[in-house]
Curated annotation (Swiss-Prot):
Domain of life per record: Eukaryota
Biased composition (Low complexity): 511-523, 616-630, 753-768, 803-813, 870-881, 1156-1170, 1240-1271
Comp. bias intervals (Basic and acidic residues): 1418-1463
InterPro entries per the UniProt record, alphabetical: NPC_Nucleoporin, Nucleoporin_FG_rpt, PH-like_dom_sf, Ran_bind_dom
The name this protein goes by in its record: Nucleoporin NUP152
Alphabetical list of PROSITE patterns matching this protein: RANBD1
Chain positions of FXFG repeats: 729-732, 835-838, 910-913, 1074-1077, 1127-1130, 1141-1144, 1152-1155, 1173-1176, 1236-1239
PANTHER family: NUCLEAR PORE COMPLEX PROTEIN SIMILAR TO S. CEREVISIAE NUP2 (EUROFUNG)
Chain ranges of the RanBD1 domain: 1289-1427
Keywords on record: Membrane, mRNA transport, Nuclear pore complex, Nucleus, Protein transport, Repeat, Translocation, Transport
Species this chain originates from: Chaetomium thermophilum (strain DSM 1495 / CBS 144.50 / IMI 039719)
A GO BP annotation: mRNA transport
Subunit structure: The nuclear pore complex (NPC) constitutes the exclusive means of nucleocytoplasmic transport. NPCs allow the passive diffusion of ions and small molecules and the active, nuclear transport receptor-mediated bidirectional transport of macromolecules such as proteins, RNAs, ribonucleoparticles (RNPs), and ribosomal subunits across the nuclear envelope.
Comment, domains: Contains FG repeats. FG repeats are interaction sites for karyopherins (importins, exportins) and form probably an affinity gradient, guiding the transport proteins unidirectionally with their cargo through the NPC. FG repeat regions are highly flexible and lack ordered secondary structure. The overall conservation of FG repeats regarding exact sequence, spacing, and repeat unit length is limited.
Length: 1463
């Protein structure tokens, strides 16, 4: 027989969980449960399977323990699994001796055959061993003895179960083998490898202890009998309907509702289905557990099981929620979701304190309202943040506390009662709101307190206050040590022990309630964290409590004897101000605010000055005010006493409350008061309006004398009798003529609007950073400096330099240079305060940074040059520098700024403009406009004077002026023509600008007229006159003026040596070396010094060539003759004696020349005199190298001349650029293509042939002539473009159809010669080719429709160069369709180029479909040309018009050249 099989289960106790029993159903009280019956707690469980314990198998050969041995062993209670009900199983003895189903009886009452913990509950009396016989009604007797031992060695004592003990007979399972696993592994060891081997004692002892003490709990109280046993988990799992679309779990009530008895109510029905689902869960768990073979995480598996079971019970409403305290994170999230403050939980249960001790730094630094308003018990005081308790106290510590020698007694206390709690006193005083007649003066938030001396640290300024105030850092301060032995729970005793004066302030016993609980945390402060211990003269620590107002208040020294009565009640209330000022220290931001009348309570965050004991004893008396301390933000808090105190320095220097008599504290940015010598950072402080003079400014006895003044950061200094210290950023010198200080200095705002005060006439002007002054006589310069003018005050210079200068006062220089002036002068007025970036109070006006300044009267003795040169000008000549960008009214001798116009004679450091010839000798600003006598700025427009130079790019209006480089000017005979501007025909044209008349020399950037003086030629341009230098880019005026570096000078008769590259006049004058502008030459003087590279004529010039002053196109032929202007950047005047740019040729033929050789003496020998190696065409005259105006005689090695120049098929000549066609019409190669040429109408040329009616040739020709107006365009980088996308003539046309095609033309014998020079880019047809068709080009074929006329033409540009292969009108008389034999071809007729006759063409496309589409497009658009048959081609009309325009321009140029030559 097979070894006994058994089925292991997951949470089995003695047996597997949830086994179906055969006992009839019985009452819940009859505690016998079936292991298969699913409790209400257990999820649906695996179906009950027959189990047999290998250890108890009768076939096991192992020796069993005797009955006596088993009886003496310890009986271990049945283990409890995740579900106590489900983990209980039924013993075999209960099954064998079970009463009737109707009579419930406890299972333990049938002890006949003993069941061991390892026994299989399905065995009948432990006698049937095989699974096949287990479930039979009458199983056979076992073959061996029925003794059964468990691994634990103890008989089982089954517990009552809520399920019935009936076990219905089931068919035997198909298999007989199960895993060798204990049926209750939670409490017993695993079975050994040998099925019958008993467990060892060690294993028994260890494993039996695991879950033996687990208490069983019912999942829910049963209201129904146990469901039928046959409804096992396995059967229920099989009953689940198969639904592939089901998502989620399915429950028993959804598909097993028919199994529920109809008499059940809702609760019973839910319990019934819950038990069924728990059985199904148990079955599923067992299946998983068995299949995994113990290789799963048992803890996670158990958690998942419990989770599933709980979900089932929750589904049926049977889950009993446990009272588990939620975690802080869960509570916080829940509160946040429901909008509940986080402090609600803490207020309900205040944290328990440990009676004091050192507190952690992060503990309750901010007060909470809940800590003030709630106490857990009447004996406990709520923990307040301000509580000064520091250590644990015992109840009997009060006696010890009273005996302490250093303990301070309550002032005025008749008995030695201990000092009350500071926190309690504060809360009670706030609740009572008993304001004393004398309250602490109200102060602004940033006002400084009155302190006799500065404290060393901002943390040391928190002074000791009376017991009415507490410190939020009280646990760190000495105030908390005063109550070392007090208990947190002793507040009632404290309340009783306090004096009547204190008790009348209290409303609550425990001090926890407050009228303003949220403010209580902010209303207390005591000793500083760094000043915790105060020691007396003997070195013993002195216990002192904070006194006075909250966070401040006058502190007074106390002796160890009983102290005197407290001064006024300085308790803070909700209406009180807050003072953060630190006593005695300089304010960083320095606005000192006088104290208002003491009408409200104040929280003073600065320590007050220490008072004498007798002073502190006077409660109704206001505290004496000492020297005011400097506030961090500078609001000075001033008291209402008559005794004024010196003002503290405010860093930002705005002082308020002008009604006070005390002197305001100096602000860092404020103007200093007369007596206060401390300077503000930005230096303007505003004193109170009603300040008295020096007798009232004296401090009281308690106040020390004011310290010497410190300079402000940005330096507006008050006028004091003592010499002020220098400013931090002061760039100006201090005022030498300081007078008696005014009582109220005016404050210059940071951006220059100072607050207005009542006595403006008494305030000195301070310089503001941006130099805008308030509308007062005594003003400070604002940073950007629009300052108000006064009659006689010194004006501060603004950075950008608009100043209003008074008559006779020294001006203070502002950073941006606008100075403010003061109204009155007097011995008692302070001078202007030094500005941070250079405003001075000296009598000498200084220049503004950009500074156009108004001229000052003659009293100003010195002008300081601003950074950019705007100055305040005075009558003193030649001392002012000009502002960089600003314009100044010009006194005759002022220095000009770099970019601004000024009126001084001093030249700026970097002068870019030429100086005028006027007697004022003023320099012109680079960009600015100046007065009429000034020289013109480089880029600016100036007013017109006859001697003025024109700006480089600006326009001018005078006839004698030189024209700007790029600007357009009025057309007069003597003006230059701009490069791009239109000028009159009589003017010479410079390269980029308007050229002057013929009397002036043309320069690249300007005009240099020739003079008679012997000056060495400039290396780059025409020489200037003898006395002046030329500016770098500007044009120089008359002979007394400096000449620009590249500019032209007026023409004189001076002798100049020939320049290196330059054009020289034909007189004895020499041309400048490297001339960028051609000079006007006179034909009367033939003797010229030869240039190093060529003739005396400026052969290497970059300006207009010839006498007409126009720019010659280096690549275009001149209209008068066919010789091209080879590389002409500007033709010079024609001379007979000049040689082309040669490296040493004298009068003979140059051996190596870059230009055309000129041989005026023998014009007939041009062929012999041609240069050996010439880059340009030879010429018979001495024209410049880059601009030849005469016909050449020598051939060019790079340009073979071809015969028909510009000839078209119609016989009309057309002008094309010189580099495209040859100039030698007599060349022998006229009918051939020259591959090595820069000119000539060969097939390699980049423009269409003459026979093509494409207007691009005409456009190119016109553009070649128009190059004179845009010579620099030749040097611009060219973008990479597609040459086939479009070209000239297509601007007014739209593409109606486009396809890539090949144009093929039928060429006859008569046409072959005419087509030899076509522009299609194709070679002529070879003789050997017998085909009459010639491919003209492949590329995009476009049907173009004119936007105005509507004419439609076919245009095909051959790839890759874009030359015209096909350009024909669509004839409406023909039908366009693909050829029948070759569907990719469309054959059509078109008019010839000369209009005589027709031609046959074919267009080949890639596919027949494309051919169909092209034919359809041609048919569609040919109607537009029906009325156009007799008209000329539109393109030819454009060509003719452009040719006419070109001819007109050439004639115009010739006339201008003749006029220039005559001049």
């Amino acid at each position: 027989m097979d070894p006994p099989s058994k089925k292991r289960s997951i949470f089995g106790g003695i047996t597997s969980l949830f086994r179906s029993s055969t006992a009839p159903p019985e009452d819940r009280k009859g505690k016998s449960t079936n292991s298969n019956s699913v409790t209400a707690n257990a999820p649906s469980l695996p179906p009950p399977q027959p189990e047999s314990n290998g250890a108890s198998s009768p076939f096991s050969p192992a020796k069993r323990a005797s009955e006596a041995q088993l009886s003496v062993r310890k009986i271990i209670p049945k283990p409890q699994g995740p579900s106590s009900k489900l983990s209980q199983s039924v013993s075999a003895s209960e099954i064998a001796h079970r009463p009737a189903p109707s009579t419930p009886a406890p299972a333990a009452a049938t002890p006949v055959p003993k069941r061991r913990p390892g026994d299989n509950p399905h065995k009948l009396a432990a006698s049937t061993s095989t699974p096949a016989l287990q479930n039979l009604p009458n199983p056979p007797a076992p073959a061996t003895s029925s003794k059964a031992t468990s691994f634990s060695g103890a008989p089982s004592t089954p517990r009552p179960s809520i399920f019935r003990n009936s076990l219905y007979a089931r068919p035997a399972p198909a298999t007989t083998y199960t895993q060798r696993v204990s049926s209750h592994p939670l409490t017993q060891s695993f079975p050994p490898v040998t099925p019958g081997r008993p467990g060892r004692a060690a294993n028994v002892d260890i494993n039996n202890r695991i879950l033996s003490n687990t208490a069983s709990t019912e999942l829910f109280p049963m209201k129904i009998p146990e469901p039928p046993r046959h409804l096992t988990g396995e059967m229920l799992a099989k009953e689940v309907p198969e639904d592939p679309n089901r998502a989620g779990s399915i429950y028993a009530d959804e598909y097993l509702a028919h199994l529920c008895p109809p008499e059940f109510d809702d609760l019973q029905r839910r319990q019934f289905f819950c038990i069924l689902d728990l059985r199904r869960l148990k079955y599923a768990a067992d299946e998983v557990f068995l299949k995994k073979d113990w290789k799963i995480n048992i803890l996670n598996f158990a958690k998942e099981y419990e989770k599933s079971r709980s979900l089932i019970m929750l589904r049926y409403g049977l889950y009993e929620f446990k009272t588990v305290r939620a975690s802080e994170a869960v509570k916080r999230e829940w509160k946040l979701k429901h909008g509940i403050p986080d402090s609600d939980d803490e207020s309900g249960a205040p944290a328990k304190t440990n009676g004091g001790g050192k507190r952690k730094a992060e503990e309750d630094l901010e007060p909470s309202s809940s800590t003030f308003t709630h106490t857990a018990s009447p004996n406990k005081r709520a923990r307040a943040t301000e509580a000064p308790a520091t250590n644990k106290r015992k109840a009997n510590d009060e006696l010890e506390e009273e005996s302490q020698p250093s303990k301070l007694q309550k002032p005025g206390s008749p008995s030695p009662a201990k000092t009350p709690s500071a926190t309690k006193s504060v809360f009670e005083s706030i609740a009572n709101k008993t304001a004393s007649p004398q309250t602490a003066p109200k102060s602004s938030l940033f006002s400084s307190s009155t302190a006799a001396k500065p404290n060393g640290s901002i943390f040391d300024n928190a002074q000791k206050t009376p017991a009415t105030s507490s410190n939020i850092f009280g646990h760190l301060s000495d105030a908390s040590k005063d109550e070392d032995n007090e208990s947190d729970t002793g507040s009632e005793a404290e309340a009783e022990d306090e004096t009547p004066a204190k008790k009348k302030k209290k409303t609550t016993v425990n001090g926890a309630s407050s009228s303003a609980p949220s403010e209580g945390g902010e209303s207390t402060q005591s000793r500083s964290i760094f000043d915790r211990i105060t020691r007396d003269a003997n070195g013993q620590p002195v216990r002192q409590l904070p006194e006075g107002g909250l966070f401040s208040g006058e502190s007074r020294k106390r002796s160890l004897s009983p102290v005197k009565e407290l001064p006024a009640n300085n308790t803070w209330n909700a209406s009180a101000g807050i003072k953060f000022a630190t006593p005695g220290t300089s304010s960083i931001f320095g606005s000192s605010n006088p104290k208002p009348p003491a009408t409200t309570d104040t929280i003073d965050f600065a320590a007050s000055t220490t008072k004498k004991p007798e002073e502190a004893a006077a409660p109704a008396e206001a505290p004496k005010e000492a020297t005011p301390t400097t506030n961090l933000f500078g609001a000075q808090t001033k008291a209402t006493e008559e005794a004024p105190k010196p003002a503290a320095t405010n860093i930002f220097g705005s002082t308020t409350n002008p009604t006070e008599t005390s002197i305001p504290a100096g602000s860092l940015f404020s103007a200093k008061p007369a007596t206060s010598t401390t300077n503000s950072l930005f230096g303007a402080t505003t004193s109170a309006a009603g300040q008295k003079k020096d007798e009232e400014s004296k401090p009281t006895e308690a106040a020390p004398a004011p310290a010497p003044a410190t300079s402000t950061l940005f330096g507006a200094k008050p006028a004091t009798t003592e010499s002020p210290k220098t400013n931090l950023f002061q760039f100006g010198t201090p005022n030498k003529t300081e007078t008696a200080p005014a009582t109220q200095p005016q404050f210059g705002g940071l951006f220059g609007k100072p607050p207005s005060t009542e006595t403006p006439t008494e305030k000195p002007a301070t310089t503001s950073l941006f130099g805008t002054d308030a509308s007062k006589p005594a003003t400070t310069s604002s940073l950007f400096g629009s300052a108000t003018t006064a009659a006689d005050k010194p004006a501060a210079t603004n950075l950008f330099g608009s100043t209003t200068t008074p008559a006779d006062k020294p001006t203070t220089t502002n950073l941006f240079g606008s100075t403010s002036t003061q109204a009155t002068s007097g011995s008692d007025e302070p001078t202007a305060k030094k500005f941070a970036f250079g405003g001075t109070t000296e009598s000498k006006p200084t220049t503004s940074l950009f500074g156009s300044t108004t001229p000052a009267p003659a009293t100003s003795t010195e002008n300081k040059g601003g950074l950019f040169g705007a100055t305040t000008t005075s009558a003193t000549p030649a001392t002012n520098t000009k502002p960089l960008f600003g314009s100044t009214p010009a006194p005759a001798q002022e220095n000009k700024p770099l970019f601004g116009s000024s009126t001084t004679t001093a030249a700026p450091v970097f002068q870019f403009g030429s100086t005028p010839a006027s007697t004022s000798t003023e320099q012109k600003p680079l960009f600015g406009a100046t007065a009429a006598t000034d020289s013109k700025p480089l880029f600016g427009s100036t007013s017109a004077t006859s001697t003025e130079q024109k700006p480089l790019f600006g326009s001018s209006t005078t006839m004698t002026e030189q024209k700007p480089l790029f600007g357009s000017i009025s057309t007069t005979a003597t003006e230059q023509k701009p490069l791009f501007g239109s000028t009159s025909t009589t003017e010479a044209k410079p390269l980029f600008g308007a050229a002057p008349a013929s009397t002036e020399q043309k320069s690249l950037f300007g005009i240099t007229p020739s003079t008679t003086e012997n000056n060495p030629a400039s290396i780059f341009g025409n020489s200037s006159t003898s006395t002046e230098q030329k500016p770098l880019f500007g044009s120089a005026p008359a002979s007394t003026e400096q000449k620009p570096l590249f500019g032209s000078t007026p023409s004189t008769t001076e002798n100049k040596p020939a320049g290196l590259f330059g054009n020289t006049s034909t007189t004895s004058t020499s041309t400048p070396l490297f001339n960028f502008g051609s000079q006007n030459t006179t034909a009367s003087q033939p003797s010229t010094t030869g240039s190093i590279f060529g003739s005396a004529s400026a052969s290497f010039t970059f300006t207009a060539g010839g006498s007409d002053g126009t720019i010659k196109n280096p690549f275009a032929s001149d209209g008068s003759y066919s010789a091209p202007t080879s590389f002409n950047f500007g033709s010079g005047d024609s001379q007979s004696s000049s040689a082309p740019f040669t490296f040493g040729a004298g009068g003979g033929t140059p051996s190596f020349t870059f230009g055309a050789s000129s041989d005026s003496s023998n014009a007939s020998n041009n062929a012999s005199s041609a240069p050996i190696f010439s880059f340009g065409a030879s010429q018979p005259s001495s024209t410049p190298l880059f601009g030849q105006n005469n016909p050449p005689a020598a051939s060019n090695i790079f340009a073979s001349s071809l015969a028909p120049v510009g000839g078209t098929s119609t016989g009309t000549s057309k002008h094309v650029p010189s580099f495209l066609e040859s100039e030698n019409k007599a060349s022998a190669y006229s009918s051939l293509d020259s591959p090595f040429t820069f000119g000539g109408a060969s097939s390699l040329a980049t423009t269409p042939a003459a026979s093509t009616p494409e207007p691009s040739a005409a456009n190119a020709a016109a553009a070649g002539e128009d190059q004179g107006a845009s010579a620099d365009a030749d040097e611009q980088p060219q973008e990479q473009i597609s040459l086939t996308d479009g070209g000239p003539g297509e601007e007014d046309e739209s593409v109606v159809h486009e396809v890539r095609a090949k144009a093929v033309k039928l060429v006859t014998a008569a046409d072959s010669s005419a087509d030899s020079s076509n522009g299609s880019g194709e070679k002529p047809a070879e003789k050997k080719s017998n085909s009459p068709w010639k491919v003209m080009g492949v590329g995009p074929l476009r049907l173009l429709k004119h936007k105005q006329t509507g004419a439609v033409r076919m245009l095909l540009r051959a790839e890759p160069r874009g030359n015209i292969a096909l350009n024909k009108l669509v004839l409406p008389q023909f039908t366009y369709k693909p050829d029948a034999a070759t569907p990719k071809f469309i054959k059509f007729a078109a008019a010839r180029d000369d209009g005589k006759g027709l031609e046959t063409w074919m267009i080949q496309v890639k596919t027949p479909q494309l051919a169909q589409e092209l034919a359809a497009a041609l048919e569609e658009h040919k109607k537009a040309n029906e009325k156009k048959d007799g008209e000329k081609n539109e393109e030819s009309e454009k060509k003719d018009e452009k040719q006419e325009e070109k001819k007109n321009e050439e004639k115009k140029d010739e006339k201008e050249e003749k006029k220039d030559e005559k001049k």
